[in-house]
Amino acid sequence: MFIPSIYLHQQLHYCKTAILNWSRKMALSRQKFTFERLRRFTLPEGKKQTFLWDADVTTLACRATSGAKAFVFQSVYAGKTLRMTIGNINDWKIDDARAEARRLQTLIDTGIDPRIAKAVKIAEAESLQAESRKTKVTFSVAWEDYLQELRTGISAKTKRPYSTRYIADHINLSSRGGESKKRGQGPTSAGPLASLLNLPLSELTPDYIAAWLSTERQNRPTVTAHAYRLLRAFIKWSNYQKKYQGIIPGDLAQDYNVRKMVPVSASKADDCLQKEQLKSWFSAVRSLNNPIASAYLQVLLLTGARREEIASLRWSDVDFKWSSMRIKDKIEGERIIPLTPYVSELLNVLAQSPNSDVNKEGWVFRSNSKSGKIIEPRSAHNRALVLAELPHISLHGLRRSFGTLAEWVEVPTGIVAQIMGHKPSALAEKHYRRRPLDLLRKWHEKIETWILNEAGITIKNNVDMR
């Protein structure tokens, strides 16, 4: 073994015993390696391993174990014996193994630990492979992981599981289309995000997104705006995932061209019930064959709640004794609102139905869906609108109608916002207004009474659902 003269005295003085012992071991069996000599070299009976040392390169040996024979490198680094496996003798030529042993000794002579050098090289190779794999990851692969996160995770904002409707929006807006429509004829259309599914994530640049927005906004601006918001949340999530981190270039939220192309998501001006339409609407909704859907739609209008908030109502959330309802709120977590007389009677009818599990943690508005609660009440609402000969009004339009119709009773804005679960918009509302339930009830009952009067409905002890 070659030892530089500058280190010779120091090494002999510091680890004299180790070097001498190691040299004796190497001198025990040293022969010039040949193919035939290595073939005949075997493990003696009763031993776990044995070594045959090369006469040409003193740091190279052939180690025989019960399973195989391999070339090994052995030397001294920092005063301690260092041994590394080079490879199986069937995979390495003798001259190549000698060259590798010389290379490893050269590293030691220059003060480098060969084990660390090897680990660094492996890490670099793995890093290059990982980067190569990253560039090949498509949008659809990462999107499926994101959907799984939505199904099993919780929202960082609300600290609760994501709603069924929110997850369904992601699925529908990324659907490739071509499936038979559940209602109507013909195949379904592809969602706005479908054109991105086969795209490598590394190509999801701000310029590409700007061009995508420019195309999609022409025929469906509001849906495209919604799809963009979902896409932006997905990109933010992916940048926090180790396997997707750093793949998507640029910042969509800060890119001028992207922000310029995002369509304005504006609600339709007529997506709201007018007071003169209330009579026709109630008459049609109350005549629906499905009493659960009928009650659901009426409660939605008379509470101003979000569609999923009412759909997720359980019997344990309804307090008939103290006339209150606990609503799972996406802003505050939950809110308590009054259980007004007409709504109370609607729910009483459902509670008395044979299949109701009012004494359990059952859904108020149950259905045959997988979750057990009402999922898609739009079809029932659309039938009622056709029957009433009214223009299309969305389920969210019923929530909008509550806030609009409340102005006829001159209800304070903060009262309506608290009932509907709107985020406080003023400093006083946010920090100082904590209205008791009785005060909310006073105004909420006024709103309900006015709406029912306009609809020509008289409150009785028992409400006729039909």
Curated annotation (Swiss-Prot):
Signal peptide: none annotated. The gene is intF. Residues 134-239 form the Core-binding (CB) domain. It holds the Pfam family Arm-DNA-bind_3. GO terms for biological process: DNA recombination; provirus excision; response to X-ray; symbiont entry into host cell; viral genome integration into host DNA. Belongs to the 'phage' integrase family. This is Prophage integrase IntF. Keywords: DNA integration, DNA recombination, DNA-binding, Viral genome integration, Virus entry into host cell. It comes from Escherichia coli (strain K12). Integrase is necessary for integration of the phage into the host genome by site-specific recombination. In conjunction with excisionase, integrase is also necessary for excision of the prophage from the host genome. Residues 268-445 form the Tyr recombinase domain. InterPro entries: CB, DNA_brk_join_enz, Integrase-like_cat_sf, Integrase_catalytic, Integrase_DNA-bd_sf, Integrase_DNA_bind_dom, Phage_Integrase.
